[in-house]
From Swiss-Prot:
The gene is SYN8. Coiled coil: none annotated. Residues 164-228 form the t-SNARE coiled-coil homology domain. GO terms for biological process: Golgi to endosome transport; Golgi to vacuole transport; Golgi vesicle fusion to target membrane; intracellular protein transport; vesicle docking; vesicle fusion. Belongs to the syntaxin family. InterPro entries: T_SNARE_dom. t-SNARE which may play a role in determining the specificity of membrane fusion, protein transport and vesicle trafficking within the Golgi/endosomal and plasma membrane/endosomal systems. Its main location: membrane. This is Syntaxin-8. The lineage of its organism: Eukaryota, Fungi, Dikarya, Ascomycota, Saccharomycotina. It is found in: Endosome membrane.
Length: 255
């Protein structure tokens, strides 16, 4: 299952590298930070799968070949290159040259010795036998209860890759936030321009209305001034008396 998943991840990595090559070589464009984050995340996941799976020279060679095809220097290729570690145990003792003799009593004792033809190769026989103890179970419990040294779960290379991926993700988030703030600033400028234009038009209309009212008041004041200077002002009392007399006559006729 891990091998199938690793093959699928390698196919995805190959597609990403081909797309990146077309972007750099054909379009002459630089990859964005999101592209770098995606590529490094894919490389990190493949490295984890290679470390978990059984050694496979074909998949390792394919991965390193795809890694070499990355066209730009935004990704440190040597940092993501996978090198198979071959563990050799030089102190391993051949089991075929050892024989066991078991003495069965209340407890079981196992003694390991070599043949006579192998004694001349090594003078002393290494102490590989288990000494007899009255309470073997207690000694086993004590050995099991001793704290084991902690094993490193993550290598420095994986830790550096994870930190670099986190930094790139933070950079992409900050870039998206900056773009959002820029769009908000542009929208606020558009709103400001629209409000200013509306206020200017309202002020112009208000000034026109005030000017019209001022002209109307000036005409009315001139008319009143002309009325005050007319002859009707001098004969106004007589006219009022005549109007009152006519009104009285009409009342008398009606009654």
């Amino acid at each position: 299952m891990d091998v199938l998943k690793l093959g699928y991840e390698l196919d995805q990595l190959s597609d990403l590298v081909e797309e990146r090559t077309r972007l750099v070589s054909v379009l002459k464009l630089a990859p964005t930070s999101n592209d770098n984050v995606t590529l490094k995340r894919q490389l990190g996941s493949i490295l984890e799968l290679l470390q978990k799976c059984a050694p496979n020279d074909e998949l390792i060679s394919r991965y390193n070949t795809i890694l070499d095809k990355i066209p730009d220097t935004a990704v440190d290729k040597e940092l993501y290159r996978f090198q198979q570690q071959v563990a050799r145990n030089t102190d391993e003792v051949s089991k075929e040259s050892l024989k066991k003799v078991r003495f069965k009593n209340d407890d079981e004792l196992t003694v390991m010795y070599k043949d006579d033809d192998e004694q001349d190769e090594e003078s002393p026989l290494p102490s590989t036998h288990t000494p007899y103890k009255d309470e073997p179970l207690q000694s086993q419990l004590q050995s099991q209860s001793q704290p084991q040294p902690p094993q490193p779960m993550v290598s420095n290379q994986e830790l550096f890759i994870n930190q670099q991926q986190q930094l790139l993700e933070q950079d992409s988030h900050l870039g998206a936030l900056s773009q959002s703030i820029g769009r908000t600033h542009d929208i606020s400028l558009d709103l400001n321009n629209e409000i200013v234009s509306q206020n200017d038009s309202l002020l112009v209309d208000l000034e026109n209305l005030i000017d019209n009212n001022g002209r109307n008041l000036n005409r009315a004041s001139r008319s009143m001034h002309g009325f005050n200077n007319s002859r009707f002002k001098d004969n106004g009392n007589c006219v009022i008396i005549l109007v009152l007399i006519v009104v009285l006559l009409l009342l008398l006729l009606v009654l």
